């Protein structure tokens, strides 16, 4: 059975056909509409899926935000503008006349990464460090989504009570410090206004401030991982995202994690999948997991 998988992100929309063998075919991509209106998103989704839907038997959506009862929510509702409560599942069912499921994109990616692990692993946590910090938790070979869809939003746990205000409305979240956006926001002087990619480049050239910003991010993530180990007793943590997979970053996280007491140590692995983990994870869940 073929799944039409859709990934809804802040900057792009992607879709592909994924067969029972897990192979991705006919991948398409469009920019996410700049206008945060239901009509604009519906029109963009229609344009995205119309060439593919005749070849699929079901639809699986991986989306940024919180998915609750098939609709789109956010930790900070203001972030969604007019898309708050957008009925993702209902919209795609109307567009395609196919059965549809929806899940948070990081939760979907966690499920894809879990499938790529050694068969002896039953408990893992996936963390994506990119523009933001997200994640997903697999416990006893089951993906945890929670009754309200919030499970795995580990970027919004507390890192520093005196830290910067996070977009979710809390103060001092991991995301506000460790993410690409957080790294860039803390830059000062000649690095002020630089994005995370530029800061990583400057760090590689020996810039002291850039190196300090990256170390701050890695240290914050290591502390989060120690907390995750204490909370879930996971067997491994898989790290992905543009920051998480940046050259040398995971090694830094490992260095800081090694400074924690031994009980909080856990194996760290680089993500197997990159851009298409959300698509693949959503399709895998549609094939065999009830949400």
From Swiss-Prot:
GO terms for molecular function: ATP binding; N-acylmannosamine kinase activity; zinc ion binding. It is an enzyme of class 2 (transferase). PROSITE patterns: ROK. Keywords: ATP-binding, Carbohydrate metabolism, Kinase, Metal-binding, Nucleotide-binding, Transferase, Zinc. Zn(2+) binds at residues 156, 166, 168, 173. It holds the Pfam family ROK. It catalyses: aldehydo-N-acetyl-D-mannosamine + ATP = aldehydo-N-acetyl-D-mannosamine 6-phosphate + ADP + H(+). InterPro entries: ATPase_NBD, ManNAc_kinase_bac, ROK, ROK_cs. Belongs to the ROK (NagC/XylR) family. NanK subfamily. Homodimer. HAMAP family: ManNAc_kinase. This is N-acetylmannosamine kinase. It comes from Escherichia coli (strain K12). The lineage of its organism: Bacteria, Pseudomonadati, Pseudomonadota, Gammaproteobacteria, Enterobacterales. The gene is nanK.
